[in-house]
Amino acid sequence: MDAKARNCLLQHKEALEKDIKTSYIMDHMISNGVLTVVEEEKVKSQATQYQRAAALIKMILNKDNYAYISFYNALLHEGYKDLAGLLHSGLPLVSSSSGKDTDGGNTSFVRTVLCEGGVPQRPVIFVTRKKLVSAIQQKLWKLNGEPGWVTIYGMAGCGKSVLAAEAVRDHALLEGCFSGGVHWVSIGKQDKSGLLMKLQNLCTRLGQEESFSQRLPLNIEEAKDRLRVLMLRKHPRSLLILDDVWDPWVLKAFDNQCQILLTTRDKSVTDSVMGPKYVIPVESGLGKEKGLEILSLFVNMKKEDLPVEAHSIIKECKGSPLVVSLVGALLRDFPNRWAYYLRQLQNKQFKRIRKSSSYDYEALDEAMSISVEMLREDIKDYYTDLSILQKDVKVPTKVLCVLWDLETEEVEDILQEFVNKSLLFCNRNGKSFCYYLHDLQVDFLTEKNRSQLQDLHRKMVTQFQRYHQPHTLSPGQEDCMYWYNFLAYHMASAGMHKELCALMFSLDWIKAKTELVGPAHLIHEFVEYRHILDEKDCAVCENFQEFLSLNGHLLGRQPFPNIVQLGLCEPETSEVYQQAKLQAKQEVDTGRLYLEWINKKTIKNLSRLVVRPHTDAVYHACFSQDGQRIASCGADKTLQVFKAETGEKLLDIKAHEDEVLCCAFSSDDSYIATCSVDKKVKIWDSGTGKLVHTYEEHSEQVNCCHFTNKSNHLLLATGSNDSFLKLWDLNQKECRNTMFGHTNSVTHCRFSPDDELLASCSADGTLKLWDVRSANEKKSINVKRFFLSSEDPPEDVEVIVKCCSWSADGDRIIVAAKNKVLLLDIHTSGLLTEIHTGHHSTIQYCDFSPYDHLAVIALSQYCVELWNIDSRVKVADCRGHLSWVHGVMFSPDGSSFLTASDDQTIRVWETRKVCKNSAIVLKQEIDVVFQENEMMVLAVDNIRGLQLIAGKTGQIDYLPEAQVSCCCLSPHLEYVAFGDEEGAIKIIELPNNRVFSSGIGHKKAVRHIQFTADGKTLISSSEDSVIQVWNWQTEEYVFLQAHQETVKDFRLLRDSRLLSWSFDGTVKVWNVITGRIERDFTCHQGTVLSCAISSDATKFSSTSADKTAKIWSFELPSPLHELKGHNSCVRCSAFSLDGILLATGDDNGEIRIWNVSDGQLLHLCAPISIEEGTATHGGWVTDVCFSPDRKMLVSAGGYLKWWNVVTGESSQTFYTNGTNLKKIHVSPDFRTYVTVDNLGILYILQVLE
């Protein structure tokens, strides 16, 4: 203790011992931490009051400066002001080193100054808000002894007063700026007499030693003058703190060149005073962690031990310090009421959350209500109108102009009043303003005006209808996004069911909205308002929702597809189809092109939802434990989280520096784990997307991650190419266990349903089971042995065990490797059953249904299969993905499953709907003959049988044959010819099905086959580089042999001549009667990929893998023109009917139109790239064809496109269900088109008349 302080205490020891009662004083000193309970007992043990006082003072004399100041403060608080006055002169300026409290500069000097100035103490339960406190202190430093105003403003209960007190609890600030002290005045809502009383009290405090202080000021003006004299002469470097100022006129009484810090709900209160002004808004509430910290302090528990309701309470409190403190104080009294208070918050029952405290109001609704009551009468109703705004929604000024029927400037003036009074918040975006309410303000208004809400929503809709037509809103309008997002909400809330149905069942609205915001929000609205929409027509609602769900991957892309054309692909009974047809017919009259898919009745779409959340391959996707959300990850290095029912995006996280290979929800859905090629494992908060942990102990890429199934103690397992498995406890920063045993990459891991075991799969050909508690290997099953034949040495056979999945009872496990799924008994390691999926594909992933015997299997040939694991029967074949399927997973209840693919999409399928699809799938080998009123399609199906399909009626004749590789029809539909994989060729006579077989055939698979015009001769080519000419009626053969490599294709010319092209880079012209070569053109360095012949048969074109195309004359050995400019393989070409134009298509999706006479480029037809690096046209352009008048061009690639040849612009796009179209067959009148996609779906399209 300082000598001055010690002497002062000794000097007045006798007076102190005579008068003080020690018990209350010791309470203060114990709470300050300067006296112990043991010391208190020693004092209490003394017999008389005098002896107890003497013992206490003796103890204080042996302590430090902090004990002296604590004793001084205790005397003040307990009413011994005269005795405290005796000790005042001995107060040390700073505490001694032994008792120094460096917490934010809160020294004993600071405590003394604040105590003298009447600054409130810290609340018993207190958490720091360092950023805001620092911001206030910075503004106070700016005053630097000069007059000025620092304003802390914010809504009711946001902690302004606590922040103001905390800001001055700083030694450096008080010593450097306010050495004259700090004086706190609580203002509140005052009239003139109340303000005069406040001023009188302040003058008395400041002028205690002045003679004129005996007479109080008689009016506000006198008080203002006296205050000015006191502040300038006696307290020149002091800070005046005015707490809770409501009215500007109040501040005029203090406007006398002082340094003032004030708290208020109304930012504009300082508009009426002079001098520098600084403003600190308190908008943001407490974060989740701070809120939990407050609750934990109130109930005296560790944060991690708080019940699950604590997190929900913080969420419902929206960060309000007042509400968190009120709830915490109530819970301290009633510790079992967590669920009750959560329910009151959720039901907006603020009246039931009441607690007396140092705050002026016992409940939040009281605090907010007083602010609203203070508004001018003429604008109160406008504030009531804001009751219909949704939380977290920023509303443009224009919306409120529509609602109130006022000019922009008038609306902005009204709203600024609300903003100034902290009843509304404003965001400036360029020249325009957006306004929003705090969540608690929304709750307060909703509860206060509950009886008026429907009328208020109706007013909003009615005003909208006065100003706008729903589908004519343009992106340039300031308010358009608000109406697209919330018009349906206002209609539903207004009870305007008829108007809501008209809106939601309008294709115009669907088109306009999806073009701007994508389909997910619309799907959400169909789900949200299903109960209303079903009142009109539940089938129509189903039609629209299904249309959006299944076309979501198209409707979210750029360029935006023609929604009317998509609608025409819906079933004819669908309301979407009927509206699209009506609209299309109107647009056809203005010259627009639309196509009808006339054979679509046979197609059933089995997916429930298709979403495209990624810009690259999707490697994994999984359901949350409640089945409400899906998380996905992939090659674009992101983690995406979206709603499982609607596809609405919830989180978009740039998760890793390299491809993300796997993701998993924790059992309580609180966290998502991701692992990556970058060797890292990361844990994310599944609600906020914040990074919680990063683990970096694997030395190679991490392939898989999986959480335990129970939430009582969360563990995460990861497997890596470094051959190790690791177990992670989320409460620890380092790996809990590393499991050694695999000799190659760990590809997959899964905890057993009871979490006792961990199964792991590896490229070493084994499945291992590990004891989770001890992290020891319990069992190793050699999966490779199930793939060995007797003659195979084990070391020569590589078996990568791709994945595993447990049965619900935990006794069995399925594993996938190569093309087999094996069901194993974990107790005996025995094989119970196996499923063989076929030789042509490998299994990528599999999952076991939680409630039945189904397994879903992803295959490399883009297909997903559902199998009954016990009966070994395939239950379903799910086609729809356009590339490899990397992941499959059942929902927790088994009612649906998801699939994730290289094609950037995730599909959700309903298990019960995906029954065995009896439709036979077509191969892409077809031939089409167009006759006057009919077309016939000859197709090869997946059982390698032949189907003869009447295009108009859809009637099918089956011509069963095995291993068909190609087929063709004779021009007059009298015969069918086909070649097979073994090189045999056959002809079937129609309609009696008599078969003629070629006696010679080819040595390898037949690839192309064609009748001559008279149908008497059949020409075929195969992989053996020979072209065979077979007059099947006379059994005469001619063999065209000269190509050095496989013949790519051929075309018949006039006069018994034939043009063929080959992988050897040459084009040859043959006489098919003699078998001689008439012309031999060495056309390209690379493979000749296609040739086209002009209609006058004088020219032909050749395209090549060398990125060029050439135009040739049959009479000249060198090309007429070499066409350069393509940046990839030129795969196809076609002449216009008059021979003036040539179109070429390449593997980048570009089509170029050239002038044949001079070889000049006329147009480049290239669809806009969807994503950087993605091929346009959905892939390679494989076929092109001009209309007879050469005004239009149709092209085949990933889908079909029609082009305006004059402008080079796209006229229409038809998105097929699958992709990779090989060829398009076009009728002579250019009105009918036939193709087959890679899913085996046949499209017969007709131009809509």
UniProtKB/Swiss-Prot annotation:
Which UniProt keywords are present, listed alphabetically?
Apoptosis, ATP-binding, Calcium, Cytoplasm, Nucleotide-binding, Repeat, WD repeat
Reply yes or no: does the keyword NADP apply: no
A Pfam family annotated for this chain is NB-ARC
Where in the cell?
A: Cytoplasm
Q: Name one GO biological process term.
A: neural tube closure
Q: WD repeat boundaries?
A: 613-652, 655-694, 697-738, 741-780, 796-837, 838-877, 880-910, 922-958, 959-998, 1001-1040, 1042-1080, 1083-1122, 1125-1164, 1176-1213, 1214-1249
Please, what other remarks does the record include? Physiological concentrations of calcium ions negatively affect the assembly of apoptosome by inhibiting nucleotide exchange in the monomeric form.
Which named protein is this? Answer: Apoptotic protease-activating factor 1
Q: Name the gene behind this protein.
A: Apaf1
